[in-house]
Amino acid sequence: KRKDKYYVTGDFYPRPTVMYFEACNHIVFEDFTVVDAPFWTLHPAGCDDVLISKIHILNDLDVANSDGIDPDHCSNVRICDCHVECADDCICLKTSKGNSEYGPCENILITGCTLISTSAAIKIGTEGVGDFRNIIVSNCVISRSNRGLSIQIRDGGNVENVKYSDIIIGTRRFCPDWWGTAEPIVITAFDRDENTRAGHIKNISYRNITCVGENGVMICGTAENKIENVVFSDVDVTLSKTSKWDCGFYDMRPGLNKEVEKHKNAGFYLRFADNVTLRNTSVKWGNVCPEYSAALEEESCVGTVLENFTGDNA
């Protein structure tokens, strides 16, 4: 049964999840391989104390919604030393409406993973009716992906205290049907629909990150719901055109009246984001396309701090 554009309800799903564990504690997934999952591969929901280690997920990059690992309303989760290739998000933290009886997604560690995704390699959201907090992502390599690190809030859950460090990100654009336009880092908070107000995003940090891709960093809130307190430290961003797909877009989907926007690409694009710090951070240009523009572009932002920020216009 399809409830609306984004949610499927009832017993029927178009394709089966490979592994679904609900309300299970003290569980270990270790040292196995999954090939060609038809839908989400590993979906723990409402679980506590979960270790996911040394697993390989090799899904068909043309099969949409074949997510890799989807912790949903889970706590005390460690995902380490995994390799994931899939035609959707490799690792996606969720607090889904279907499992809303469980608590927040909190105390999460992701480290030592190699990831390839036609969507986002590591994402928080978009399903987020509950909160997300206390999350660390480190020592990962993301390559050939449509997006690298993504926080997309569309429901009422809040996001706070998320730290990313020591990560290499390579992005390229895929077919426009996929959400994203090759942003290595993206944070957005938009209402899903007329009856759903998006939660608040604050206290996010990025340290020692190297990004090479077809688009720059995007942070977009709204006038009613600004994104707050984001710090970039020792982050290097290089924009370089490599795919056949057009540049000059930002993808705001999904959300109320949100689509792909035609807009020149900046190294850092900030809209309705307050107290953003760019420290020891640079923007460089590789293969330049006509739609590349400024190192930094801001709209309706307050409290932006630049400390040793370098970058010329394209």
Model regions: which residues?
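Extracellular/periplasmic carbohydrate-active domains that bind, remodel
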Residues: 1-314
